[in-house]
Design a protein with these regions (language model features):
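Surface-exposed acidic loop/strand-edge motifs in secreted or periplasmic proteins
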Residues: 48-123
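Acidic, small-residue rich beta-repeat scaffolds with periodic aromatic anchors
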Residues: 22-27, 121-188
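Sec-dependent N-terminal signal peptides
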Residues: 4-15
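Terminal domain-start segments
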Residues: 19-65, 175-188
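Composition- and surface-driven signal marking solvent-exposed, interaction-prone regions
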Residues: 1-4, 181-183
Length: 188
């Protein structure tokens, strides 16, 4: 009985270790893939590091999904408002398929159609930090321009008035949504 228990524990620890190694191995590959990708589509970018990669779906027989925070000037336009942060989705649809960058808008709110819908959104140009709370919840700190709801005084194109902490949650059948917005600082 004791030998079976020890054998079970050892087998479990090996399988957990191999899952972790697979996830770390994929993240290491994603660093290389993303750095090649962002260099090919943008200028003035910082290199992606392991800390910029967030696991959404761990490697399994159904594939895996990661979100990657990075910054750059897509298209190399060189304007004062063209450099931004992005959250890209990198997925593998099965263990024997390659990792693919599937979008630069993983949360679905960094696009003109969403901005024109007059919904609360994150200003990706001014992201300060992104922290994963769980696979379905993130905390993002970013600045935003003054508006009727929060007020504040902007200081030009590069000086938005308000600093917020956003909680972004995945809601079943709705997708990613801002579920909490807390004002941290304000220019008056």
């Amino acid at each position: 009985m004791f030998k079976k228990l020890i054998a079970g524990i050892l087998i479990s620890s090996f399988s957990l270790g191999s899952t972790y190694a697979s996830e770390l191995s994929e993240k290491t590959n994603i660093v290389r893939i993303m750095n090649n990708y962002i260099t090919s589509i943008s200028c003035m970018n910082d290199k992606v590091q392991l800390k910029d990669i967030f696991t959404i779906d761990k490697p399994s027989e159904n594939g895996s999904t990661y979100y990657v925070l990075w910054n750059g000037d897509i298209g190399c336009n060189g304007g004062t408002g063209t450099h931004s942060y992005y959250v890209s989705e990198v997925s593998r649809f099965s263990p024997n398929r390659p990792l693919l960058v599937t979008t630069n808008d993983a949360f679905g709110d960094n696009n003109e159609a969403f901005w024109n819908a007059d919904k609360a959104s994150i200003n990706y140009r001014f992201i300060q930090s992104m922290k994963q709370i769980s696979p379905s919840e993130f905390e993002i700190v970013s600045y935003a321009y003054a508006d009727d709801k929060f007020g504040g005084v902007d200081r030009g194109n590069m000086g938005p008035a308000n600093k917020f902490r956003y909680t972004v949650s995945f809601i079943e059948d709705e997708g990613w949504k801002i579920t909490k917005q807390v004002l941290l600082e304000q220019n008056k």
